[in-house]
């Protein structure tokens, strides 16, 4: 949110173009997997998924856990949508947080293209943090793009080239995972994969996992 214009608008228009096409497909899948009534969007960014989840089911309560500046930006959009009573904000630095810093009583812990902003050790640390906050019966739902799970070679090449862009331009760490590498991170953090669905949106994969 601290990007200067026109970079800020350009980046979020690009990012939202992909995410906006996948949330409407993934929420019904989540509903079939679990009768959730609460969701925590870890790394909720501008609140796009939180707004989609709240609109999907009027009984669902959503919490965004992200940096204070991201929560402040999301707050404006949430208020504009008239959903301030159903979408809560949990400002925190995930890398410096403990399970006690995260909301309680959450059914679905959601991460959308969030862990690919970190190196493997950091991703495992974040996953362990969330696992520590999860109650029995809760699930982890991860929306990611994997080059090795694309249906066509051209799509895989596009994902891999975008990954190189993120590493070189963003922060030197961001990149898209290889799916096998990501599964290893989940296992290292104490998760067992329940289901994997490819080909959602414009090439996303939805992984639903639970505590091992």
Could you tell me what each predicted segment is?
Residues 33, 38-212:
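Alpha-helical subdomain
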Residues 1-37:
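Conserved Class I S-adenosyl-L-methionine-dependent methyltransferase catalytic core
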């Amino acid at each position: 949110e601290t990007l200067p214009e026109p970079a800020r608008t350009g980046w979020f228009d690009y990012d939202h173009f992909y995410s906006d096409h996948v949330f409407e497909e993934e929420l019904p899948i989540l509903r079939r997997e679990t009768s959730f009534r609460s969701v925590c969007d870890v790394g909720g960014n501008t609140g796009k998924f939180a707004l989609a989840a709240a609109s999907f089911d009027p009984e669902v309560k959503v919490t965004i856990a992200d940096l204070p500046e991201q929560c402040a930006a999301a707050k404006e959009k949430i208020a504009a949508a008239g959903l301030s009573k159903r979408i809560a904000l949990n400002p925190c630095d995930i890398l410096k947080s403990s399970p006690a810093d995260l909301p309680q009583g959450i059914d679905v812990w959601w991460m959308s293209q969030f862990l690919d902003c970190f190196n493997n050790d950091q991703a495992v640390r974040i996953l362990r943090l969330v696992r520590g906050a999860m109650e029995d019966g809760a699930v982890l739902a991860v929306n990611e793009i994997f080059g090795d799970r694309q249906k066509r070679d051209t799509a895989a090449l596009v994902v891999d080239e975008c990954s190189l862009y993120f590493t070189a331009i963003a922060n030197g760490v961001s990149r898209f995972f290889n799916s096998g590498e990501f599964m290893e991170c989940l296992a290292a953090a104490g998760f067992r994969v329940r289901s994997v669905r490819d080909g959602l949106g414009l090439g996303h994969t939805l992984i639903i996992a639970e505590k091992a």
